[in-house]
């Protein structure tokens, strides 16, 4: 259920874009992201920082897109969110307070060096995706960007999540690996 809630705004954005245009889709994205927060809080009685940051960014850049009738704002949102994720992960790692370790370290007991590798891998991933988004958003047709945002970035994120899980699994202590089998 939680994963469906995470993808709900993206699905709504894509569907509305296909039937209408980028401006109505941007408004729908704002509404869907707000709905996501309300439903998430109603079900789980808490909100993750990532959801709040995403909602703030969607609201600001979606509103700017609507007010100025310029799709450049909603296109920049993706790059800025990825840049913020990369920055947060990178700074946390430099301060020896890995966000990823704090999120997953209770379930996966691996060496700090491995958490550092995973963190820098995701910093690189988010930075590259942000840069590729700039190219696709401003050099290719709008429909290509929407498809890239919805399908390309989602698929890349899922693939990188699987790679990360396999990498972490490979470095788990033997007793913990047996528990997962």
UniProtKB/Swiss-Prot annotation:
This is Inner membrane-spanning protein YciB. Plays a role in cell envelope biogenesis, maintenance of cell envelope integrity and membrane homeostasis. Belongs to the YciB family. HAMAP family: YciB. Its main location: membrane. The chain crosses the membrane at residues 10-30, 50-70, 72-92, 118-138, 148-168. It is found in: Cell inner membrane. It comes from Shewanella sp. (strain MR-4). Pfam families: IspA. One of its GO terms (cellular component) is plasma membrane. It is a multi-pass membrane protein. Keywords: Cell inner membrane, Cell membrane, Membrane, Transmembrane, Transmembrane helix.
């Amino acid at each position: 259920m939680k994963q469906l809630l995470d993808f709900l705004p993206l699905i709504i954005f894509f569907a509305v874009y296909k039937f209408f245009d980028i401006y109505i889709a941007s408004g729908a994205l704002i509404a869907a992201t707000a709905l996501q927060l309300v439903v998430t809080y109603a079900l789980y009685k808490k909100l993750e920082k990532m959801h709040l940051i995403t909602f703030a960014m969607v609201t600001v850049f979606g509103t700017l897109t609507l007010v100025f009738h310029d799709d450049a704002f909603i296109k920049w949102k993706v790059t800025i969110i990825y840049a913020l994720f990369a920055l947060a992960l990178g700074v946390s790692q430099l301060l020896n307070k890995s966000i990823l370790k704090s999120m997953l370290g209770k379930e996966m007991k691996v060496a700090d060096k491995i958490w550092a590798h995973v963190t820098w891998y995701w910093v690189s991933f988010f930075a590259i995706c942000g840069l590729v988004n700039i190219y696709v958003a401003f050099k290719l047709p709008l429909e290509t960007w929407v498809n890239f945002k919805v399908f390309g970035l989602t698929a890349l994120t899922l693939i990188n999540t699987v790679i990360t899980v396999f990498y972490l699994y490979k470095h788990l202590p033997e007793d913990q690996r047996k528990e997962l089998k």
